[in-house]
């Protein structure tokens, strides 16, 4: 048996490799011969390839195994540009290579060559491939122009590339071609123009579309009925429906075009989008005059218009009319009608229409389900909304972003923000990635329930998941930071908003200015407002209003008025709310001459005083003791048919108590609070509130107005009224009755005592000499989680001093810093008065020196006088504030809350 030696075996096994290598070397040698030594294309190669192509010897060309390059292909196309078949063959051969693809320059040559040969189908195919290369439209256009100049061919390609760009939605590139092709002897065709116009409108570029139409007319391109329909649609979508109507009529008369149902449907839809029923009727009349038949789209637009206006009966009538016309309602029409019912809160009718749709065999879709979910959520029927969400799977429908966002919003509005967050996680599992809109809904949800720390946590989660915040996200976070009192973080976020260019409108600006002013940082707010023009954001009236209110809050009334004057110079006129604030400020800081000026000015501007305006005036007159002017303002309200509310009545009653007009105050309280209903059998209070025969006629008139004209629902007693009643009893010396009323109110479950209620009673007990009861009430406050403040302790110190127990009062003073409470001028003045009366003048002088060191002494006080207000109900510090409860201020009287702020 013959066996091969190892050397022979190796040689035998290497034969195929050696043969292949020999062939490859030959090919490379040929390719080297075809190129010059420096890598450039050799003329003889170009000549040989061109000759084979011209002779049609394509098989021989394939055998050459050409090493294609951009230079080789472009050279051949340039050489054979008058032979489209040869060019097409070499281009296709090059396109089939494994390691080579023609570049954009080759494509530009090829489309010109094919266009000249009138091979438009292949030209368009290659143009689509050229666009798919994703080269810059400007670069492609430049090369097409260069080839056009080099070859001296027809510019037909320019119109074709315009149409391709338009059809692909690349309107920016299409517009560049449209603007420049006229320079090279080619105007756009009507088909290309229509394609460009249609895609511009589809992308929402309505104003650009109208401008393109004007250019098209200037190019003397005659529009057809399709052009007119597109332009009408552009006008309608930009909100200029009347202009669309004028354009349609002018086109009809000047161009002699017969507008079709598409044009009229666009007009009807335009009027429908703005809820103009009369406009829709005019178009319908025009259709009848022109003999244009209505179709399903026509009726769908009519239903949309009626739904937009909330005229659901008319919408249903149109829906029934469709059946009489033997037209079949489609999915879209059902969806429009159901959405109308959902938006108007008629969810049962929406479900009825949906059931009818399913019954006749029309399939539901995601948009319809979204409308139903939205309707259920808005009516608070979350369970039903969840059922629709679950049934979408049965209907083979996939929830989209809008579905989830609607349901998330429903949970948030109902206060179930944690459930909404779980649904957000479920979105991720279903591969529906939450968008910034989803997170905005969640952020608003947490903010709405006051969970501001959760707002911060959600913000961090959003950023961690790679979701870019928008202006709404930032404004919500800013609001949360201000609520938490975090000034530094708010400023950092504001700088980030500016750096990212998110300040596009006044939403975030208003939140920033308002937040800073509420923190009494008006200088920072003013600085931001001064620099905001750099970012092309124009402040609105609400922006200036917030700044003006901020100055009012910090006591700088001059700057508050300066803001008003500045905005007027800018052509922005103050609202009634701003006037209300300035009126309150003029009263508070005793600029009474400005009050009348403001009232005259607001009337001259055509503004109507609101209940808040009258409340500010009544509060102001009461605060300075001018009860007659307060009465006159009340009578003006009554004459104008404006209802007196509980806050205004409480304010007047409180002022009457302060002026020792107890009978008149009681008469008003009787009309505000039905104590017989609230506390049946409470005879002592009833006797106290019974007015005497000497009651002022003006007060009687107001009381009768309250009884006769004020809806009971507007006079539901609140803490203010009850506090006024308790204060009135204390003022009248009926401390036991006040305590009994307090006890009975607690048992009625209609009253939640606050720190100010306790302060009233503590003050009453202390003044009456029952200091032990006063301290017991103080302890009761603490047990209920209500923290006593300086006014509470001032009342206790006053009671101790009145009993002559000055030592205990001093000990209580020394304990205040341990409780985190800072003594004020009232504290020291009360104790000084007690020390002087007890004969300890030296200690009184020491405290006086301490007051001076702490800056608590003003003007004449440094000479030894004590400035204590004369008109008080309980204590010069106590007043009912704008929050609905009593505020404490050492420089103001006990006062019902500022009605203007409360109502606003």
UniProtKB/Swiss-Prot annotation:
PPR repeats: 154-188, 189-223, 224-254, 260-294, 295-329, 330-364, 365-399, 400-434, 435-469, 470-504, 505-539, 540-574, 575-609, 610-644, 645-679, 718-753, 754-788, 789-823, 824-858
Organism superkingdom: Eukaryota
Pfam families given in the database record: PPR, PPR_1, PPR_2, PPR_3
KW Flavoprotein (keyword) present: no
Listed InterPro entries: Mito_RNA_Proc_CCM1 (IPR051114), Pentatricopeptide_rpt (IPR002885), TPR-like_helical_dom_sf (IPR011990)
Keyword Repeat applies: yes
A GO BP annotation: RNA splicing
Keywords per UniProt: Repeat
GO cellular component: mitochondrion
Family stated for the protein in its record: Belongs to the PPR family. P subfamily.
PANTHER family assigned: OS07G0671200 PROTEIN, PENTATRICOPEPTIDE REPEAT-CONTAINING PROTEIN PET309, MITOCHONDRIAL
Full protein name: Putative pentatricopeptide repeat-containing protein At1g19290
Organism (species): Arabidopsis thaliana (Mouse-ear cress)
């Amino acid at each position: 048996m013959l066996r091969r030696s190892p050397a022979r075996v190796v040689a035998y096994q290497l034969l195929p490799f050696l043969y292949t290598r020999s062939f490859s070397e030959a090919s490379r040698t040929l390719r080297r011969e075809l190129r010059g030594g420096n890598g450039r294309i050799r003329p003889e190669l170009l000549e040989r390839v061109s000759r084979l192509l011209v002779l049609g010897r394509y098989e021989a060309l394939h055998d050459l195994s050409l090493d294609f390059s951009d230079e080789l292909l472009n050279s051949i196309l340039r050489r054979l540009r008058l032979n489209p078949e040869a060019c097409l063959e070499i281009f296709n051969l090059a396109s089939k290579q494994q390691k080579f693809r023609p570049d954009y320059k080759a494509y530009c040559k090829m489309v010109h060559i094919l266009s000249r040969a009138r091979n438009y189908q292949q030209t368009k195919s290659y143009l689509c491939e050229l666009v798919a290369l994703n080269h810059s439209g400007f670069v492609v256009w430049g090369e097409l122009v260069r080839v056009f100049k080099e070859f001296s061919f027809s510019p037909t390609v320019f119109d074709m590339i315009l149409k391709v760009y338009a059809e692909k939605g690349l309107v920016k590139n299409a517009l560049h071609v449209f603007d420049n092709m006229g320079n090279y002897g080619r105007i756009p065709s009507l088909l290309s123009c229509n394609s460009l116009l249609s895609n511009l409108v589809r992308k929402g570029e309505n104003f650009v579309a109208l401008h393109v139409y004007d250019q098209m007319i200037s190019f003397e391109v005659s529009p057809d009925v399709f052009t007119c329909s597109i332009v009408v649609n552009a006008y309608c979508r930009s909100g200029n429906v009347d202009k669309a109507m004028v354009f349609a009529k002018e086109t009809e008369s000047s161009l002699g075009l017969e507008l079709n149902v598409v044009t009229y449907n666009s007009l009807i839809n335009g009027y429908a989008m703005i809820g103009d029923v009369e406009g829709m009727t005019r178009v319908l009349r025009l259709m009848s005059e022109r003999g244009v038949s209505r179709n399903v789209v026509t009726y769908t637009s009519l239903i949309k218009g009626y739904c937009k206006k909330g005229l659901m009966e008319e919408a249903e009538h149109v829906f029934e009319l469709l059946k009489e016309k033997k037209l079949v309602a489609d999915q879209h029409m059902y969806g429009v009608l159901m959405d109308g019912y959902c938006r108007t809160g008629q969810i049962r009718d929406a479900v009825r229409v949906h059931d009818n749709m399913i019954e006749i065999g029309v399939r539901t879709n995601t948009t319809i389900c979204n409308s139903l979910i939205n309707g259920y959520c808005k009516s608070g029927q979350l369970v039903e909304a969840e059922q629709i969400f679950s049934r979408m799977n049965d209907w083979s429908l996939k929830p989209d972003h809008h579905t989830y966002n609607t349901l998330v919003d429903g949970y948030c509005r109902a206060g179930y923000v944690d459930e909404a967050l779980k649904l957000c996680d479920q979105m991720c599992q279903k591969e529906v990635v939450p968008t910034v809109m989803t997170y905005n809904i969640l952020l608003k949800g947490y903010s709405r329930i006051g969970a501001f720390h959760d707002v911060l946590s959600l913000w961090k989660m959003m950023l961690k998941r790679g979701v870019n915040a928008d202006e709404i996200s930032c404004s919500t976070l800013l609001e949360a930071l201000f609520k938490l009192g975090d000034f530094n973080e708010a400023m950092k976020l504001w700088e980030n908003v500016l750096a990212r260019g998110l300040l596009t409108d006044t939403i975030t600006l208003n939140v920033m200015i308002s937040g800073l002013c509420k923190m009494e940082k008006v200088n920072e707010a003013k600085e931001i407002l001064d620099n905001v023009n750099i970012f092309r954001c124009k402040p609105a009236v609400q922006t200036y209003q917030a700044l003006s209110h901020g100055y009012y809050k910090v006591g700088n009334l001059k700057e508050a008025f300066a803001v008003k004057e500045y905005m007027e110079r800018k052509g922005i006129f103050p609202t009634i709310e701003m006037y209300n604030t300035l009126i309150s400020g003029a009263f508070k800081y005793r600029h009474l001459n400005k009050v009348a000026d403001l009232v005259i000015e607001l009337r001259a501007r055509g503004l109507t005083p609101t209940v808040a305006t009258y409340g500010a005036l009544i509060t102001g007159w009461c605060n300075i003791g001018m009860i007659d002017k307060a009465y006159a303002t009340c009578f003006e309200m009554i004459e104008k048919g404006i209802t007196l509310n509980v806050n205004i009545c409480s304010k007047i009653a409180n002022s009457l108590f302060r002026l020792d007009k107890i009978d008149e105050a009681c008469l008003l309280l009787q009309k505000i609070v039905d104590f017989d209903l609230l506390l049946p059998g409470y005879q002592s209070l009833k006797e106290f509130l019974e007015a005497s025969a000497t009651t002022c006629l003006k007060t009687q008139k107001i009381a009768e107005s309250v009884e006769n004209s004020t809806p009971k629902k507007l006079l539901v007693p609140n803490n203010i009224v009850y506090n006024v009643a308790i204060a009135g009893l204390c003022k009248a010396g009926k401390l036991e009755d006040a305590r009994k009323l307090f006890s009975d109110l607690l048992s009625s479950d209609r009253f939640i005592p606050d720190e100010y209620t306790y302060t009233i009673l503590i003050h009453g007990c202390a003044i009456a000499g029952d200091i032990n009861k006063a301290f017991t009430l103080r302890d009761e406050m603490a047990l209920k989680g209500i923290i006593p403040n300086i006014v509470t302790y001032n009342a206790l110190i006053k009671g101790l001093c009145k009993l002559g127990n000055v030592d205990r009062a001093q000990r209580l003073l020394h304990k205040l810093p341990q409780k985190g409470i800072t003594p004020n001028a009232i504290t020291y003045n009360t104790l000084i008065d007690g020390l002087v009366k007890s004969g300890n003048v030296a200690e009184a002088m020491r405290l006086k020196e301490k007051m001076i060191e702490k800056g608590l002494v003003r003007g004449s006080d440094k000479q030894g006088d004590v400035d204590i207000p004369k008109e008080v109900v309980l204590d010069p510090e106590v007043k009912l504030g704008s929050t609905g409860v009593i505020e404490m201020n050492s420089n103001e009287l006990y006062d019902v809350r500022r009605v203007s702020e409360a109502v606003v």
